[in-house]
Regions:
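Interfacial loop at the N-terminal end of multi-pass membrane proteins
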Residues: 5-10, 30-63, 84-86, 123-124
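N-terminal signal-anchor transmembrane alpha helix
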Residues: 17-35
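Actinobacteria-biased recognition of intrinsically disordered, low-complexity terminal regions
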Residues: 1-16, 153-191
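Individual transmembrane alpha-helices with interfacial aromatic-anchor signatures
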Residues: 96-100, 124-142
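Transmembrane alpha-helical segments of integral membrane proteins
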Residues: 111-122
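Membrane-water interface at the C-terminal end of transmembrane alpha helices
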Residues: 137-157
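Cytoplasmic juxtamembrane regions at transmembrane-helix boundaries
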Residues: 9, 78-100, 159, 163, ...
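Core segments of alpha-helical transmembrane spans in multipass integral membrane proteins
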Residues: 22, 29, 48-80, 103, ...
């Protein structure tokens, strides 16, 4: 793995950001479905609660809808930061949101690592296996991606010519061609 504090290039930041934002948006969508009263994939609200949280917690709209809003805001923050959308202040706020996402995922991954050892969890319960196979690995991987994104500066990358939300990275050759064209236009207008 690379150093998590090394900033990402623009193209990789967009890929990482899209992946993390999609995970968070998908999580928000699943919680919105649960807020309707559906307990998929479990048979009951209690079974769902134990599979997801290893505790009996009410899966009611009062609990789930604020969580949906938080996850949606987190997804938007990561997407805005990674795709360099908006003005400088918007991007700074989005970077802070991305750092918060990284911190939250790191915290959940740490708790998951403890639960993998069997501390505070029944190793025969569905939660243990979901945590081992799905929850903790996802938090480690996406937390790493969010940490790398949070380390990526708000300023536009020097590899782009426009400085704002590039469609793709500009190659050195393309930049040289653009400079020559601008010079020719300047000569034409000036002379």
């Amino acid at each position: 793995m690379s150093n998590p504090l090394v900033p990402l290039r623009a193209s990789r930041a967009r890929r990482f950001g899209s992946a993390v934002a999609a995970l968070l948006a998908g999580d928000a969508l699943v919680h919105a479905v649960w807020a309707t009263g559906l307990t998929w994939p479990a048979d009951s609200a209690r079974g769902l609660s134990y599979a997801v949280l290893n505790a009996d917690v009410p899966f009611t709209p009062k609990v789930l809808l604020p969580l949906c809003a938080l996850l949606g805001t987190a997804a938007a923050s990561v997407y805005v930061h990674s795709h360099r959308v908006g003005g400088r202040r918007v991007r700074q706020a989005a970077r802070l949101g991305t750092a918060a996402v990284a911190g939250g995922l790191a915290l959940r991954a740490s708790a998951g690592a403890v639960w993998i050892t069997g501390v505070g969890v029944d190793v025969d319960a569905p939660f243990y296996w979901l945590n081992l196979v799905l929850y903790t690995p996802a938090c480690v991987g996406f937390g790493y991606a969010a940490m790398r994104l949070a380390a990526t500066p708000v300023e536009p990358s020097p590899e782009t010519t426009t400085g704002e939300a590039p469609a793709r990275e500009v190659t050195a050759r393309e930049a040289a061609v653009a400079r020559r064209r601008r010079a020719r236009i300047g000569e034409t207008l000036g002379g």
